[in-house]
Amino acid sequence: MKQGLTRHWAAVPLMAALAIDGGTALAQTATGKGGAASGPLAMPADYTLVWSDEFDKGALPDESKWAYDTGMNKQGWHNREKQYYSGPRAENAALKDGRLVITARKEALTTQADWGGQQYTSTRLITKGKAEWTYGFFEIRAKLPCGQGTWPAIWTLGSQGDWPASGELDILEHMGQKPDWVFSTVHTTSGHGGHGVGDGRKLATACGGFHNYQMLWTPKEIRFGIDGQAHAVYPNLGKGTAQWPFDKPQFLILNLAIGGDLGGEVDDRIFPIGYEIDYVRVYQDKR
């Protein structure tokens, strides 16, 4: 496993682990170990803004804040994904009307030295080496793409060590094949891939409008929510780094994958298709 930048899902994908039935998303773990949550989720009053991108300057993503992750293009990305992630290229990532738009396209960039045979292009942006955080309140306002085969995500990876030992926090994952559902999941040595800990929430307007996807990460727990309402929680059980590697920095990732274990079969009629991010904001307790 390459340090920090890649992940493998278990043979049983997340969709199977979450077991959607009759409009209810079932938590992946027993009560007390994490899973479903409810109630309000708000930024603590004593937190202050420490990092943000409002996507209101320039034409392309700010490379003082973001790097383009293209490292697995030649050999192919994990999870059987079908996209080629491009470098700086307005066709795949551009700033428009104060928003970042990540666009997936049906095209093959055969002239690129790292092309691995992919028939789709997209972008994966990371803050690794530019901005990393331990604890905080994260808020990303986004409108998700809806199309069979899309797999947009907002997530973090540990910057120290390999996956899953360094941890992964999926603030949001969405699959075009389940357009009314969004998911948040935590991956660690003690539970990863199809055995990650988290829950899903039905959100009928996930594709139709903007929503605030949120994570409150403290030394005691990690809580995920949408528009100020919590839906998943992961507690620190005091069982060591296998269960809680989250006392070390994580970096942020924004990407739009195509196909793969969660994206599913791809409908080529959906392209080009865009994933819009209005802003990314990180707050911390700086007292």
Task: Describe the role of every protein-language-model region.
Residues 28-287:
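GH16 jelly-roll
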Residues 6-7, 20, 172:
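Residue-level micro-sites within transmembrane alpha helices that shape
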